[in-house]
Amino acid sequence: MHGHLYIILKESIKYIPILGTGMMFYGFIFLSRKWATDKERFTYRLKKLSTPHEAAVTGANPKGLNPMWLLIFPEGTNLSDNGRKASTKWAEKNGIQDLRHALLPRSTGLSYCLQELRDSVDYMYDCTVAYEGVPVGQYGQDLFSLRGSYFQGRPPKSVNMHWRRFAIKDIPLGDEKIFADWLLARWREKDELLQQYIETGSFPADGGFGEDENGKKVKGAGLIETEVRTAKWYEFVQVFVPTAALGLLMNVVFKLIGMVLRVLHLR
């Protein structure tokens, strides 16, 4: 069971009509990019996620924790023209080389998440994403917008992902500088992965043999190709049902308030 999904996003996204309301309804974590403020939000939300529940859902682990995914973007924003400029400026300010196909990561938020969750979470998964059909120098967010993908029928032909898994016990969390260097090294590896995708049209696939955490010999899955689609045509609509219901409820409440005020005014 995949369990719950929580996404860490920049605060401005929650003000998007309908979508932003839905994200707040589902408990997503919004950040202001001011650590003094964000640390309190992180502490509150992460404490809830790492607290055992008496009545955990089906699939809960032996620690009594509900299964969940916590998604964080250490870059803090989409790859775009403005994001590219900000990454270059950050690189110049810190005397480091900028990346070619990704944005430089910020380490503070991820480091705090891992430290708060390391007693309840064993692994961190790293995903590198590439969209088919994005020319070098252009950005996926400009070509595959929400409107173009869902309402104009122009989605990317394929979405390519490269996954890696890191044991949290092996990640250097004791020193902020060492962790920042470790994270930057992983991002330079991601930049090389994206370069290979540009040159070959695919990410490298692990088809060899290795060992799992128990020392058992296992074979890599290689390149996995699958098609993702909804089972029923109306499933996409169901995503918006909670937010639409909330919007209708708020509309009714405001109308009732307006009626009461008018009655009081007539008196």
Label each PLM-derived region with a short phrase.
Residues 1-139:
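Soluble catalytic domains of membrane acyltransferases
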Residues 29, 34-37, 80, 175, ...:
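Intrinsic-disorder/low-complexity, polar/charged segments
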Residues 10, 31-33, 127, 164-166, ...:
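Conserved beta-strand termini and adjacent loop/short-helix elements that scaffold enzyme active sites
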Residues 221-262, 267:
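Alpha-helical bilayer-embedded segments of polytopic membrane proteins, i.e.
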